Curated annotation (Swiss-Prot):
The keyword Ligase does not apply. This is Bifunctional protein FolD. Belongs to the tetrahydrofolate dehydrogenase/cyclohydrolase family. One of its GO terms (molecular function) is methenyltetrahydrofolate cyclohydrolase activity. It catalyses: (6R)-5,10-methylene-5,6,7,8-tetrahydrofolate + NADP(+) = (6R)-5,10-methenyltetrahydrofolate + NADPH; (6R)-5,10-methenyltetrahydrofolate + H2O = (6R)-10-formyltetrahydrofolate + H(+). It comes from Mycoplasmoides gallisepticum (strain R(low / passage 15 / clone 2)).
Amino acid sequence: MFIKLDGTKLSQKLKEDLAKKVNNQKIKILIIISDPSEASRIYVRNKINYCDSLGIQTEVYDLSKIDDTNQFIVEMNQKISLSNPNGVLVQLPIKERLDTNKIIENIPIRLDVDAFLYHRFDQDQKEKVIPCVLNAVLELFKEYQLSFLDKKILLIGNGITSNQPIVNYLNEHQIKFDLITKENSQLLEEKTKVADLVISAVGKAKFLANYQFKRGVIFIDIGIDKYFDPEQSKYLICGDFDYDKLKEIASYGTPTPGGIGPLTIYSLVKNLINLSEIQKVNK
């Protein structure tokens, strides 16, 4: 029997704990935008709405007109000094002409809500501020009593905010896995047939629809895209997997939307609250 890994339902449950932690505290997040696309603005709006519902202050700073990396960093840091937030979110993607890694490396560690710089955190911050997608997956596994152990694990894609933190986690815990990227994509077809757990972060609509998976597979869909549905004459949100098709043979899986997405926003705000608490202790 297939069980839907319901990220929306779980995030609503976990949100109650966040509300208790906030408890009328003054907490503020600064969101910096580089990409002017509608998709980025939707992502930002969802995060703002979530923060608003908890009484967390948000400020958006639009740097989408800047095409020089050094100027971007200077203006970002000037705004951080003026705004005095508890956390900073640089919304990805960053425009291609800018150096994403250099910008991320210049986010103050004490304000890094996405945990991009997790490798530079001290031990206390590492325990309390976890990369958002990784935490989303761990929360789902905890709720549905799933595990990485004793499984053939297949990761597809390794973006900085998606599968890369999961790669790091599995390596730290000495858990074996296969990773498919552009460099070895010719292996994808044979790997999907034998994997017990597949986590995909490609971001192409139903990218895996025509691949074969084993019966009982667990699938986690981090990718998000849209496709045109001629029957409804409109675009619909979807992930890398064909959810309706795969759930016929899978044991567990995440829908898109409603799977990983809501839990990444929860994880972001959880990190923000924990950063605020760390800052109070270190004052």
